[in-house]
Amino acid sequence: MKFWQLILVLFISFIVGFSTNVFYENFKLKGPNEDQAKFTAFLDEYWEYVIDQNPTFASLLGYEGYDDKVSSNSISEFYKNRDFEKYVIDVLEKINPESLTEDDQLNYRLLLLSNETDLESRSFPGFYMRLNQRGGVQDYYDLASRLKLESIQDHRNWFERVKSYSQNVKNSLDINREGLEKGYTQPKHIVRKVAEQIDSMTSKKTEENPYFKSFSKLEAMNSDEAKKLLAEVKEFIEDELMPSYKELSTFLKNEYIPNSRDSIGLSGVPDGKAWYEFKARSFTTTNLTPDEIHELGLKEIKRIRKEMEDVIKEVEWDGDFRSFLDFLRTDPQFYYETGEELLAAYRAMAKKIDAYMPTLFNKFPRAPYGVIEIPMETAPYTTTAYYNSPSAGRPGYFYANLYKPETRPKYEIPVLTVHEAVPGHHHQLSLTQELENVPNFRKYSGFTAFIEGWGLYSEQLGESMGIYDDPYDKFGQLTYDMWRAIRLVVDTGMHYKDWSRDDAINLFLENTAKTQLDIENEVDRYIAWPGQALAYKIGQLKIMELRDKTKESLGEDFDIKTFHDHILSFGSIPLNVLEEKVDEFIVENTK
């Protein structure tokens, strides 16, 4: 799943920039004395400022008045965030949570935890290491695909945003130059990819530039006003926006890359090991150390490998494990010739899974979803699939990578669809957004371990749905389970144990049927995004543990549909809180 794309939002988490002084005064003036009333008012004020200072986020949620604005990516915004988080913590510590309703005690706990975690993250200079191939200043244009661009005014608003992006590109250059001076850089390998992405965009003719193409509906309007606006857009892209991108690319190639680090792990920057230990805790919502996570990954690899070998015996393969993997990677029967065929297969699988959903759930979201292709501008650099949740009347979308279909095996289609669409992220995140009597900060942010743990858990639900209806599809599911187990090993290996990129790639090649291109893109993702890949398997194992615990406790009274509805009814929560809620469920349902 792609994290901007997820969209800065899925909104697994969001970063906000606040004009805090005004907020403080407003809150002091409005805040009642009683803790319950004060907390309720604080939630409202908090959300108002989240929206006010995050115009892109506001637009995606359908709030009016923000469609021509963007947030700054400057260092000063980073410090505003820090000041606001300190203030939120200060306000919450003056409220007695025991005086709140049971629901608000949970809201209080989650809001405090989120801000404490965000504040701790600011003890590390993450703003110097934002550059990565998965998204950033180089693909701001992608936002247009999530906006309503129908009228001339819609396009005029979008143009105002595009004009602001030029300053953000310049800010990126300044921030990365400062990071270079202080020894905080992304690895050479990652930044080369970013420079390639920028050069790919700036080398296009204006008519083929993704920014210009985002205004394509203006041409069809065929009015003088539309023609004038389109001419202004063209002039700005050619005279200001692309030159700012070219300047950034030149800086990256001539100054940044030659002087950035060769090491790929976070341990290669000052205080990098402590930084990674924090990331491991925050992404998994546990106190597991990198060493403990590494060992857990090795155990899971051994367990899953045994299941994979059982499938190989079932198909009566007469070679060894490695030769079977080579067979899956290279035999034409496992691949479509065109992207159109691949997309049609994903859509057919989604419809098939939809029919099975009532066997596992009682509650369903109102929001629909679709299956569409990842834009070709970013497809070569990104992973196999990702999901973007519904926004402002727009459906949720499962994005499938159609680039080089000869590297996208058919046996991945079932497992990817259950993870990204239903019963995975679309089902989960749409239900979260539709929760009633839950504050907005819980509807549109969350904890990666639960979100991605549910996605991986959903892959196993495909077994009971019968969608792995031949051994190769089952091997595909096991490959994806193995993939997440290997993540525990390679992520900790690269960022904490000085593993090389080749070490990580080879572990994948030896144990999964994923293709070379997929593996390389995945490993590069882990290099650019330390710690995030740990969340999937840790979350999945906890959900499975809690399901088994509930089933054992309730015996014949256990109902899988009720259990699933229950654990999704709180939105995205830390794993320890999830366990508390399951324990309460067991007590309430024990006769």
Residues covered by each model-derived region:
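N-terminal maturation segment of proteins
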Residues: 3-5, 9-591
